[in-house]
Structure formats: C-alpha cells, structure tokens
C-alpha cells in the first residue's frame, strides 16, 4: 500500500511539472466558451489569488517548491535570455539570523503583533535577482514571479511579493553577510523576495480600478 501511495504521489508531481513545461494545443472556441460560463480554471485561479501575510509554520516541501520554480522559469522573457537568478531559502537559521539583523536596525518591527520574521513569518522565501546589464531584466523577473505565485496558489500555497526585505539586504552593510550567501553572479542585483507558505488567513479581495484599462478606437 505504501508503495502504491508513493507511486501515485510521484505521478501527481510529474503531472504538475508537465503542466508548467509542456506546450498544449488549445481549441479557441472551447476556451472562449469555458471563459464565458465561468469554468476556466486558469482564470479562476488568477482572480481568486490573494497576497498572504499570515502563514502556518510548516515549510513548503521541496518537491512542491520545485514545481513552483519550474513554472517560474517557464515564464515568457525577452529573447529567451532568462535574465534572472533565483535562490530558495527554507533554512530557519538563515531566515531568523537575518531577521535579528533587521530587528537591530528596525526595533519597532519586533513590536508588531505576531512578528516572527521579516518575511511576513513565511517559512520559505525565494530571492530573485535581475541582470543589471539587460534593460528588460526586471520585466522578465516580474513575469517569473507572477508565474510562481499563481502556480503556488493553484496548489493551496500562499505567497506575498516583498520589496522591503530586498531593499534592506542591498542597502544595509549589516545584511551583507546574508546577501553574500545567496551567491548571485557579478552584475546581478537582488530585486525582490517572495514569501511562500500555507495560508493562516483568508483575506478578502481588494477593489481594482477598471477605469485604468481602455480600448483605443
């Protein structure tokens, strides 16, 4: 029975990975119909996604994170340069050690209710760096991040894109030790972080301003 469960689990992971990497032919008529009657799973996932700022302590297992990362690197990007560098940290010593450095320079942060770490208490953090020599690298990195967050949400994993911790790590000399551990190549700069974990909240949707989008005749 255990062997059967392991085999089925492996098949599920393979299917999820294939979903992020294998091209699939679509019937345009069927896709449009599914969208109109509300059965399009991709659109449903996009519209239901929320930024999560409260997490359960359980880290996301690495097999699941590998699926999320694979979806990320399959994002569209300019000239297929793949102008990103990605690092994943689920080591509490790294996260807590960096948080202690952060607290020394921002003592008020520790007074926030429920504060445990500077990544919204997430147990897993992804660090994304862009290539400073390529104009559109930041765009590429943003597309990569969006893919990761949406794929995570489809598997019940929450996320939150964080700019503040990245800025702290690049600006504070006290954080240099931790930035060095990420081992980014020369010319790459930490752009943002993404917190990942199992949600411990169910936030409501925030309003979007549809007036910012217009068709031009």
What residue ranges belong to the model's regions?
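Acidic, surface-exposed loops and disordered segments
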Residues: 2, 7-15, 19-217
């Amino acid at each position: 029975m255990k062997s059967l469960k392991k085999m089925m689990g492996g098949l599920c992971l393979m299917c999820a990975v294939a979903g992020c990497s294998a091209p699939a032919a679509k019937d345009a008529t069927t896709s449009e119909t599914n969208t109109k009657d509300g059965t399009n799973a991709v659109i449903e996932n996009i519209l239901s996604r929320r930024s999560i700022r409260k997490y359960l302590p359980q880290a996301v297992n690495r097999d699941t994170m590998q699926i999320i990362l694979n979806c990320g690197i399959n994002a569209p990007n300019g000239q297929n340069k793949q102008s990103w560098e990605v690092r994943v940290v689920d080591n509490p010593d790294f996260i807590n050690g960096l948080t202690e450095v952060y607290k020394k320079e921002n003592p008020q942060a520790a007074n926030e209710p429920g504060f445990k770490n500077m990544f919204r208490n997430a147990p897993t953090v992804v660090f994304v760096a862009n290539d400073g020599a390529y104009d559109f690298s930041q765009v590429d990195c943003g597309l990569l991040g969006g893919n990761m967050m949406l794929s995570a949400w489809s598997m019940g994993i929450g996320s939150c894109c964080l700019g503040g911790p990245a800025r702290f790590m690049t600006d504070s000399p006290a954080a240099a030790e931790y930035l060095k551990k990420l081992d980014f190549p020369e010319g790459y700069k930490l752009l943002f972080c993404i917190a990942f974990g199992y949600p411990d909240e169910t936030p409501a949707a925030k309003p979007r301003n549809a007036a910012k989008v217009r068709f031009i005749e």
